Structure formats: C-alpha cells, structure tokens
C-alpha cells in the first residue's frame, strides 16, 4: 500500500516523533510498502531509506503557529501527490500538525482513511510546564516555546480534538495520553481509539559487548572523559565507586533538570565518586551550570549539547544509571532506550512512565521531590547485584513488548482495518 506520513518532526529533527516516524517508515518499506513523508523543511539532509520518499513543505517559524502553517502546506502537497500516485492510508502525527475538522473530513472523503497518532497533548504539555514552574525549575516564562504552550495550548487543543473525532482511528502512545483526550477533549463524544506504546531501536540501543575491543575502547574513553573511571567502572562492574549517572533530553524546564541537580549533593554525600552527564540541546545550559556552581557540584556535572546516535548509544551502555525526572511526557522513549541498553532507569512515579517502568527494571521517585530522587538513586547505586538484575529484566521487557518490529505489525493491522471499513462505507 501507499502510505502518506504527515509528521512535523523527521530526521535530521531527531525528536521523539521524528525518531519513531523514521523507524516506522523504514520498517513499513521493508515489508514492501511505499511511504511518502510530508514534513517541515530543514537545512539538513534527511537520511535515505529505500522505499521512503520525503517531501518538505514551508512553515511559519513561530512557536505553536508553525503547526497550523505546516498543516495547511502539507494538505496542499497531499492533494497534489494523490492525483499522480494515490494514497491508500494517511497517518497524521499529532500534535505538530494542526488540521481543522473540515480538513480531516476532506482527507477521509476524498483521499484515504486517516490514522491519527496522539503523541501526548498540548493541554498535558501545559500542565507539565506549570508543574515544573511550581517545583522551582528554570523560569518557564523566559522560554518562547514554554510561554507559547502556557498561553495558547487551549486554543490549539481544538485541532487535536478535530483529529480525534473526525478520523477513522486515533492511536495514543500511552494509556495516560488516551485518558487525557477522553477527559479533556471528548467527554461523552464518540470516537475510535486504541493504545500502542512506541518501541525503540533495540539493535542500536543494546547492552555492552565486552568482547568487542573497539567498543571497549569507546567505553573507556567515555569513562575517562567524565572522570568516573576506577578499574571496576572500566570493566563494567556494577560495584564501581565512580558511578556514571546519565540524563538525556531537551534542556527545557519540564524535563526536570533542576530537580536532578538539587538531588546531587545528597547523592554525592553517599557516593562521592559519582558523576552526572546531561545530554541535550536547549536554552537552559548556562542556567544549569550556574545552579551546579551554586550547589558546589560543578566538578561532578557535565552537559553535552548533542552527539551522533552511535555515541549516544554508547553513553547509554557505559552509564551505570539513567535518570529521567520529566514533569510531562506523552510516553517518554528515554527509559526504553535505557532499558534496551541494559542500564536501569530512575524516573517519576507518574503515568505514563509507570506504564513502562516499575521496581523490577528500575526505580521510581515522587515527581519534583529532589530528596526522594536522591534516596532512590542512592539505594540503587548501593545495590550492585539488584542493579544487575534490573538491567537484565529491562532488556527482556523491551524485547518482549517495545520494539519497532512490534509497532510495524500493529500499525499494519490498523491500516488494513481502516481500509476495510472505508471500503465498506464507500
């Protein structure tokens, strides 16, 4: 079949949506399907995949407003392409594409049945920003994107509701996301929806192979780079006295980095050789470093703006523990990438993170509570054997439920189902 994928993120925009769309498209193409990605224009070059074509459209470079301008231009291209190579299914990834009810109905009636992926919600994002601000994270009013979300989330939620109520099916990325839409967007209204949690690339994010000399050298280089390099650490032993904590994600307030930094003095009191490595792009780097200096932990904190997928995957393998203190996620892929890499994860005791993480594969702490975060990290660092068991269990969990192979089979079933229903009704 010919599948149109409308996604506001696509590599080289490697956000959560961009990553899952890239891998889903590649897996669909490997099954012999034709995939056309309609995405926002970018100065970089998208990685090529056989069977996947990419069409870029212009967009207004303003927070939130870009979702509407991008959607309008994407629809124009969709209509034009459909005339020469008809589409069988349209897969729209919300919330980064804002279509009206009329536009969704047009697609359904004149082009092809529509599947909407719900990657969280604008109203949920707004609640996350508010919770982060109340918890003393970096000033959210100073970030244009956070400010736009706080002020306009309610307005733009109408486009998400339009997708939920006017397409063949909506697929939420967690039970938590589906609950948000049921309670905030469509109380008492009829719609067709289900839940499929996204997986991760279990071949890229995999446990360490200590028999691979090149990989071992890469591991040692990372541990030396961050000064967490006692002999046990270099040998991947969980009993190391120089543990490496890893946090990955955009440097924005709702990711909870200030809470993590405030936990570090208590972590260092029990594990003085610990180092924290934060990897992410964003406006907060200087503020985070100032906070680290204020807390007298600068020598134990490193912030990297970004790196290649291979380097990132090696960081996951080389870390002793991944910490994910986010105040809001539609799903949150970092914990899966951590578990897939054989590294236990500490995250918040809130859905949707609790849909993937429990005490068999990691640890949970009260959201926004830096003392509880420190206690959870300390308990896990002090239990080397338990951490090894959690690492093994996490990898098994990912392979059993959370891979792109699972996703492609699930979405092919959905595509076929809405195609069949569309044929019966036409």
Functional labels for PLM-detected ranges:
Residues 306-307, 314-319:
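Short alpha-helical donor nucleotide-sugar binding micro-motif in glycosyltransferases
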Residues 359-370, 379-385:
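Conserved acidic donor-binding segment of nucleotide-sugar-dependent glycosyltransferases
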């Amino acid at each position: 079949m010919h599948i149109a994928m409308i996604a506001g993120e696509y590599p080289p925009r490697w956000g959560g949506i961009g990553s899952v769309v890239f891998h889903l498209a590649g897996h669909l193409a490997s099954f012999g399907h034709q995939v056309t990605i309609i995405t926002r224009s970018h100065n970089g070059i998208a990685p090529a995949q056989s069977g996947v074509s990419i069409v870029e459209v212009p967009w207004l470079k303003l927070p939130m407003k870009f979702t509407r301008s991008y959607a309008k231009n994407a629809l124009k291209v969709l209509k034009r392409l459909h005339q020469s190579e008809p589409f069988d299914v349209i897969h729209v990834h919300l919330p980064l594409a804002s279509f009206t009810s009329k536009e969704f109905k047009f697609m359904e009636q004149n082009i092809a049945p529509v599947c909407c992926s719900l990657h969280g919600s604008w109203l949920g994002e707004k609640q996350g920003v508010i919770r982060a601000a109340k918890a003393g994270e970096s000033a959210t009013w100073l970030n244009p994107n956070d400010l736009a979300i706080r002020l306009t989330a309610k307005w733009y939620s109408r486009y998400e509701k339009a997708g939920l109520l006017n397409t063949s099916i909506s697929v939420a990325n967690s039970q938590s996301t589906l609950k948000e839409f049921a309670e905030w967007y469509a109380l008492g209204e009829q719609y067709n929806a289900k839940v499929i949690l996204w997986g991760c690339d279990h071949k890229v994010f995999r446990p360490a192979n200590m028999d691979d000399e090149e990989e071992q050298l890469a591991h040692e280089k990372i541990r030396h780079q961050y000064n967490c390099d006692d002999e046990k650490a270099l040998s991947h032993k969980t009993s190391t006295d120089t543990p490496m904590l890893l946090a990955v994600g955009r440097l924005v307030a709702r990711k909870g980095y200030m809470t993590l930094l405030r936990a570090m003095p208590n972590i260092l009191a029990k594990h003085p050789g610990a180092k924290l490595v934060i990897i992410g792009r964003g406006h907060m780097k200087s503020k985070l470093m100032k906070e680290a200096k204020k807390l007298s932990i600068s020598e134990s904190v490193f912030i990297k703006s970004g790196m290649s997928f291979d380097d990132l995957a090696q960081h996951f393998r080389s870390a002793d523990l991944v910490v994910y203190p986010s105040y809001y996620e539609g799903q949150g892929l970092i914990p899966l990438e951590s578990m897939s890499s054989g590294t236990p994860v500490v995250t918040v005791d809130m859905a949707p993170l609790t849909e993937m993480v429990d005490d068999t594969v990691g640890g949970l702490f009260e959201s926004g509570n830096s003392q509880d975060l420190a206690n959870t990290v300390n308990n896990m660092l002090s239990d080397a054997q338990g951490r090894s068991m959690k690492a093994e269990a996490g990898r098994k969990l990912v392979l059993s439920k959370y891979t792109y192979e699972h996703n492609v089979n699930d979405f092919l079933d959905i595509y076929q189902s809405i195609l069949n229903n569309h044929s019966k009704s036409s």
